[in-house]
Amino acid sequence: MHNSPIKTVVIVGGGTSGWMTAAALSTVLRGQYSIRLVESDEIGIIGVGEATIPMIQRFNKVVGIDENEFLRETQGTFKLGIEFVNWGKLGDRYMHGFGRIGQDLWTVPFEQYWRKMRALGKAQDLESYCITRMASKANKFMQPPSDVTNSPLNDIAYAYHFDASLYAKFLSKIAIQRGVVRTEGRIVQVTQREGDGYVDAVVLASGERIEGDLFIDCSGMRGLLIEETLKTGYEDWSHWLPCNRALAVPCESAATLTPYTRSTAHRAGWQWRIPLQHRIGNGHVYCSSRISDDEATATLLANLDGKPLADPRMFKFTVGMRNKAWNRNVIAVGLAGGFLEPLESTSIHLVQAAVSQLIDFFPDQGFSSADIDEYNRMSRFHFERIRDFIILHYHQNQRTDSDFWKDCAHMAVPESLVEKMKLFRSRGRIVRFDNELFAEVAWLQVMQGQNLQTQGYNPLVDLQSEEDTVEYLESVRNVIAKCVEVMPEHSAYVASHCAAAKMGM
């Protein structure tokens, strides 16, 4: 009996997490399983402007989503990276651009040659050698061309900005077309099997009982199944990431449609800016023990590009993760599994990663403990590596204008991050742990942008003469500059490929 296949999958909660899960499972399971999604119209979803990372392209391709249609339906724009303002110190500005920087030479990473020449005053800023950073600076965008080879244009890596609630709506249509049954209703009771405590049904206010074999908890931070029912426990990381509230508000669009997200550090947190076709999504993530809600609201509203289109909405959170993402026959996806502030636009990716792992470890009714343990190990690894990357932004700062930033600079950080920073300080080397999300080039840009100083460079760089290295760097810079010149404006590219219908608020 234990090897019998799963018959019914019940997804508790809609929103982006629920409908991403439903769309992916209905595609991969090909109608061989019953999939039900339960959501209540009484419960609002956190539908703000959402920024993503390039991995989302893989998800959309698996589901079979046409890119231009998706962007039209979600008021979406393209994203080449994230600009960070005032993060190292007041007045600092740098970008984490997607994709490659320069071109490696022999077995030595490009940035090692750059580092030597930069110290000698013979190299430009790092951004000059990254096509996505230079294109962002010029507000240019194009997709990698299929008819051009051996060009920096092939290295254009990109993601998207879109309206999260519209994305959920878009995915719901796909999932329902592929057999997912949506049930509207408020869950008032969760029942468990005697003996092992597995969830066997959810009961709605209407009295309807919905049974299932596998339950996916997409109920948000409350964790209706994973926490309120199974008491899984939550690991609090607020001693490393003390921000615990966010205010979100849309505003009128600016004149220029920028192809990047912006993060501006404030006195006790930071503000996001996400450009959509019809508006700009804004939010202020802050620490409530260092700034009042009224002050945080005033800071947010004082730093908008245009007129606010709604009243700010507040969200309270504790950064951290569940002790287990998979407990018995319940898998937590999205905010039900944990929360990391969206500084590096990882919220959607964490949903994608959870769904991908679920597909890799899809169970039968035996619910293998080995599979569950490995799923939980992978989930923890994924969360912890992203956690470290976010902590780096806070910890490696030189700001002295507030106790918040001074405390972040002096706090103890995870040993895994200590080792990464120590290695970089030595000779600028970066080691990527196993399959962690962020590649070496991402760590490089943030470490460099946050002014983490190195004591040297790879000695193999000295095998090439300074003259040849300068010539090589200059050739890379010139080719990238010429490529950016031929790229269209981001706004023009959106208008010609994926312009959405005009819509009001």
Feature-to-residue mapping (PLM):
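N-terminal Rossmann-like FAD-binding beta1-loop-alpha1 element of flavoenzymes
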Residues: 7-33
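Glycine-rich FAD pyrophosphate-binding loop
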Residues: 26-48
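Dinucleotide-binding Rossmann-like beta1-alpha1 core, especially the glycine-rich loop
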Residues: 48-136
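Conserved N-terminal helical subregion
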Residues: 95-189
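Predominantly flavin-linked oxidoreductase catalytic cores and closely associated redox partners
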Residues: 149-296, 355
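Conserved FAD/dinucleotide-binding core of flavoprotein oxidoreductases
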Residues: 266-317, 336-350, 361-365
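Conserved mid-domain beta->alpha element of the FAD-binding
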Residues: 320-385
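Long, low-complexity C-terminal extensions of enzymes
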Residues: 360-505
